[in-house]
């Protein structure tokens, strides 16, 4: 069971990576390659693509670092909120998208 969950997580990670990669490729190509009249990229297009991809990768790393720093605090806050809600008698812990009446 755990192995299947790991495989599913790996597939999700791969899918997410490919989505980011494809979006980055599309964005940089549209920005840096104005025409398809030549088979090869010229030096200016190559430099533009290198710069564009570098900026996007750097931005992605900074966002991921911020996410990694914030995540423990968010998890602790959610745990505290859940514990506080479950400590109050007669009050069911609210879950996003689920109404307390079960409907």
UniProtKB/Swiss-Prot annotation:
GO molecular function: metal ion binding; unfolded protein binding
Entry keyword annotation includes Disulfide bond: yes
Motif interval(s): Twin CX3C motif: 28-52
Gene3D superfamilies, A to Z: Mitochondrial import inner membrane translocase subunit tim13 like domains
Disulfide feature: 28-52, 32-48
Protein's membrane topology: Peripheral membrane protein
UniProt-listed SUPFAM superfamilies: Tim10-like
A GO term from the CC aspect: mitochondrial intermembrane space protein transporter complex
PANTHER family given in the database record: MITOCHONDRIAL IMPORT INNER MEMBRANE TRANSLOCASE SUBUNIT TIM9B
Full protein name: Mitochondrial import inner membrane translocase subunit Tim10 B
């Amino acid at each position: 069971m755990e192995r299947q969950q790991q495989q599913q997580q790996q597939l999700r990670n791969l899918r997410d990576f490919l989505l980011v990669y494809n979006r980055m490729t599309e964005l940089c190509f549209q920005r840096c390659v104005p025409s398809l009249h030549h088979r090869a990229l010229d030096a200016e297009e190559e430099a533009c693509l290198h710069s564009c991809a570098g900026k996007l990768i750097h931005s992605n790393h900074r966002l991921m670092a911020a996410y990694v720093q914030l995540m423990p605090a968010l998890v602790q806050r959610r745990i505290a909120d859940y514990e506080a809600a479950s400590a109050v008698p007669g009050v069911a812990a609210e879950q996003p998208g689920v109404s307390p009446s079960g409907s």
